[in-house]
Every structure is written in structure tokens, then in C-alpha cells.
Amino acid sequence: MCSCLVVKNTVIGSGRTKIAVPLVARDAAELSAVLEQIKNMPFDIAEFRADFLECAGSIGEILHHTQTVRDALPDKPLLFTFRRHGEGGSFPCSDDYYFKLLDALIESRLPDIIDIELFSGETAVRRAVANAQKNGIAALLCNHEFHRTPPQEEIVCRLKQMEDCGADICKIAVMPQSAEDVLTLLSATLKAKELAAKPIVTMSMGQTGAVSRLAGQVFGSSITFGSGTQNSAPGQIGVSALRATLDCLENGAD
């Protein structure tokens, strides 16, 4: 039975699927514009995608921009994500830099949730998870497959591996090559929901997989990602359209 996670009065893992909006910007001016544009959008969680910054190689600059986001959205749960190139992100970096950055963000206590890539070395991942939780930050462990959809059993196994590493939220995103692949992801989500003790987040990417972003409440995915001003992953739906569709599915259409 999945237990929920409460972050700034937002309940993750129970009730309606929560909408996260990625904040994508190259510099301070773009970030300011993005924050202005999304402030009245119907989202639940802000995800700061720091890997898109031109200054992504500077921990100090990233901390500065994260503070800007925190100040602009004081009441929204803030998910900090630094997606590396190998998992579909914009910045290639070493494990050493990656974990130094995560440590700095954790110790700043600016984010409420921090994204940690599962396949970054088990010892380092477990240490980062423990450090986050010690500082009152929820650890979201994640994995991304940009070229295929693994079998159902493998998807469930990876989500279980995240939970075994201490994750507060377990996330996997896969790329479908067919409609059957989308069904595989949804079936895996349903199975993982039955087994998991922590909230799970799943999605099938691209246009073919877009339906998975709308079906979380039925199959068990706790968060869906919708674009605010710019997509951060293939197949994201605009936040306003996403909210309207989720409302329609939840309340029923006449």
C-alpha cells in the first residue's frame, strides 16, 4: 500500500494526480520571464531544470538561480532537477561534479524535493538520498529510457530498486515504439502501485505516449509533467490543457 508524501500542503501519492511544470531558462533574464509567465498557471509543483542554464558548470550560479525560483514561488513545492546528458539532459558532467552540485543544493535547503539519477553508482546515490532526508528534502530517484520501453517486469524492478535505495518518490520515463509499449508502461505502473510503499511517477514519452500523462490517477502515477513555456521532455502537454483534461476525467463529462 502506497504511503503519501506531503510537501508544502501538497499531497503526493493520494488523490488527484499533481501537475509539475518544468522551469526552463538559459539565464537570469529568461528565468525571470518564465516565472512571470507561469505564476498564474494551474500547477502544483515547480521543477527547476538547472541543466538548461548557460552557467550549468557553476555551482554558485545555480544556487543563485535556485534562490530566485524559491523567492518567486514560496508556497509551491520546488523540485530541483539537474538532468545529465546520458539521461536526456542538456549538460554532460562527471559524477564528481554531479554529486557536489546535489550536495550544495541539499545543504542550501532551497528545494523541497531533489531529483537523483538512479544509475549513478549505488553508494553515491544512497549517500545523496540520506543527506537529502537528513536536511528535510524529499529524494526523487529517477531513470529515463529515451530509445525503448523495457518489459513490464524490468520497469517494476527499477521502481522497486529506487525504493530499496531509500527514495521518497520513484520515477521512470520510457520511450514507446508502439501503442503496445504504452500499455506495457501503464500495466507496469498498476503493478508497481500495488507493490510500492512510496509514491511512483511514470510516463511514456513522445506523442504516442501522451495518453500516459493523463492516466495517472487510474493507473497509479502520482505526478504528471506539463509544459509551461517550453517542453523539457518529448510529449509534454501544456499545463492549462493538462489541468482541464484531468479535471474532465476526474469529474466526468456530460
Swiss-Prot record:
The keyword RNA-binding does not apply. Pathway: Metabolic intermediate biosynthesis; chorismate biosynthesis; chorismate from D-erythrose 4-phosphate and phosphoenolpyruvate: step 3/7. The keyword tRNA processing does not apply. Involved in the third step of the chorismate pathway, which leads to the biosynthesis of aromatic amino acids. Catalyzes the cis-dehydration of 3-dehydroquinate (DHQ) and introduces the first double bond of the aromatic ring to yield 3-dehydroshikimate. Homodimer. Belongs to the type-I 3-dehydroquinase family. NCBIfam families: aroD. This is 3-dehydroquinate dehydratase. It comes from Neisseria meningitidis serogroup C / serotype 2a (strain ATCC 700532 / DSM 15464 / FAM18). The gene is aroD.
